[in-house]
Structure formats: C-alpha cells, structure tokens
Curated annotation (Swiss-Prot):
PANTHER family from the UniProt entry: NUCLEOSIDE DIPHOSPHATE KINASE (PTHR11349)
EC id: 2.7.4.6
Lineage of origin: Bacteria, Bacillati, Cyanobacteriota, Cyanophyceae, Synechococcales
InterPro entries given in the database record: NDK-like_dom (IPR034907), NDK-like_dom_sf (IPR036850), Nucleoside_diP_kinase (IPR001564), Nucleoside_diP_kinase_AS (IPR023005)
Subcellular location: Cytoplasm
This protein's record includes keyword Cell division: no
UniProt name for this protein: Nucleoside diphosphate kinase
Gene behind this protein: ndk
Length: 152
C-alpha cells in the first residue's frame, strides 16, 4: 500500500546557509520516511515547469532565476498526513508571518529567500514528484519501527 507522499525542496539559500541536515532532521524526528533524495542545480526549464502556476505573476522571472542559481535538495517524504504536516513544519510563505518553531519562522527572513518549498496538496505533490524524480529514483522501503509510528 502506497502511503501519502509529498515533494519538498531545500532552495539554494537553504543549501548555501548549511541547513540541509537540520531540515531533514525535522522531518525524520516527526516520523516521516525519506523515499527520494537528490541534489541538483535545476535547469531554467525545470524551474519554469515547477513554478508554472505563477507564470503571469511579476515575480516569476526572478523566482525561476533564483531556483536555478544554485544547488537544490529535492526530496520525497512519505507518511500519514505528510502533506499537511510538512506545510505546518515549513511555516507560512512569508517568513515574518511564520510561527517560531517552523523552518521559515526559525531560519528565514525574506519571502524571496524562504529556504524551502513544499507541495500544497495531493495533486501538486504528484505533479512535483513526477517532475523532479524518475520512478527508479524513488525507494519504496519499510522502516523497522513503522508499527510504532502510527496506529494500525
């Protein structure tokens, strides 16, 4: 049985500032399972496809340029309620509105440099996972403590 999955990406500012381990640790501690992980410098085309919903917005070009300016850590996380939980762990898009204890509330200041991207729903997650990962890059595995994470 496939559990809920979401796509997360540590943006170039998060990578440059050395937050990869801290961010991954927050999701591991919550009990989610990492099933896809890679670091890459996204092409402009990948960035445009990823943020296509914002194509007509005035910030689109700057967003594409930023995301493709340096390394991004792309991840697929799996677990019960992972999409909503990830959104809560990440915090509000505008870091100054993000609650303390969230990634953006603790680590980010500016909306244009808000450290991390997370899928906002099930359909978006499926689209983003398929955009960033080939099927052979996804590891379907079971944790040895899965029975202790959620009630059956």
């Amino acid at each position: 049985m496939i559990k809920e999955r979401t796509f997360l990406a540590i943006k170039p500012d998060g990578v440059q500032r050395g937050y990869i381990a801290e961010i991954i640790g927050r999701f591991e501690k919550k009990g989610f399972k990492l099933v896809g992980l890679k670091q890459l410098i996204p092409s402009k085309q990948l960035a445009q496809d990823h943020y296509g919903v914002h194509r007509e917005r005035p910030f689109f070009k700057d967003l594409v340029n930023f995301i493709s300016s340096g390394p991004v850590v792309a991840m697929i996380w799996e677990g019960e309620g992972v999409i909503l939980s990830a959104r809560k762990i990440i915090g509000a898009t505008k870091p100054l509105e993000a609650e303390p204890g969230t990634i953006r509330g603790d680590l980010a200041i500016d909306i244009g440099r808000n450290i991390i991207h997370g899928s906002d729903g099930e359909e978006t997650a499926k689209f983003e996972i398929n955009l960033w990962f080939d099927q052979h890059e996804i590891c379907d595995w079971e944790t040895s403590d899965s029975e202790w994470r959620v009630e059956s």
